[in-house]
Amino acid sequence: GCAPVNIIEGDRIFLGSNKGGVTKKHPIELTALDIDYLSQFDLIHTSIFSYIDPQLQKLSSAGLRVSYDFSNQFDETRHRELCPHLWCACLSSSERSYEENCELINQIVKFGCPNVVLTRGTDGAMVYLNGKLYEQSPYLVAATDTMGAGDSFITAFLTSYLDMDRYCRDFPIQKGGAGLLRQDDAREVAVRISMHKAAVFAASTCQQDGSFGYGHKKG
């Protein structure tokens, strides 16, 4: 796929897209071999623009953790249908108020997805994880191009958190009480550190043309 944009004072303004190109015309059909391969990974990430919604049940039924980027599409019917198959829902929601975003998070959790990452542009990000709501202010820089900032936050947060989560444990009762001894406490620290890292990584993306340095001027 491709998407032409204008860059106005560092902010990307979409002019259109080719609507997913070949992926939309010929969507992926996952085989048993594909599922077996994907089971090697901690997380499977996809999006509303990948056109594999009918395949999500296959992934969740195989016990795979799936994160899904809804972009800025707030379709209650789609949320209700897909959320039961997701481990984490990701959304871009800078146009909504804080209260509206809280309601959106509650709705997604109610529909069966336990975790939510919600990016809000210059208002930062909200993460609902392990039954708790966290917030992170943005790391503000002189932006060259904001294309991909939200995607960068999502990627950096999820990879960082899952990497640290594997080490979060409840310690057995023993002499002394120094450090983090409870799994829940360690996970809370992991969430906050991961959000901090994600904000910094997203800021670095804003200083690259075309998100990762390969933007092309059209015309």
Indicate where each model-derived feature is located:
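Active-site donor-binding loop signature of nucleotide-sugar glycosyltransferases
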Residues: 17-19, 91-93, 137-138
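Conserved beta-alpha-beta core of the PfkB/ribokinase-like small-molecule kinase fold
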Residues: 42-107, 123-125
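Alpha-helical scaffold segments in soluble metabolic enzymes
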Residues: 3, 58, 156
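Structural motif
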Residues: 2-3, 12-14, 43, 65, ...
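Structured loop/turn residues at beta-strand edges in well-structured enzyme cores
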Residues: 36-39, 84, 111
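Conserved phosphate-binding/catalytic region of the ribokinase-like
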Residues: 102-219
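Short, hinge-like loop/turn segments at secondary-structure boundaries
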Residues: 7-11, 83-87, 107-108, 132-135
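Conserved N-terminal subdomain of the carbohydrate kinase-like
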Residues: 1-42
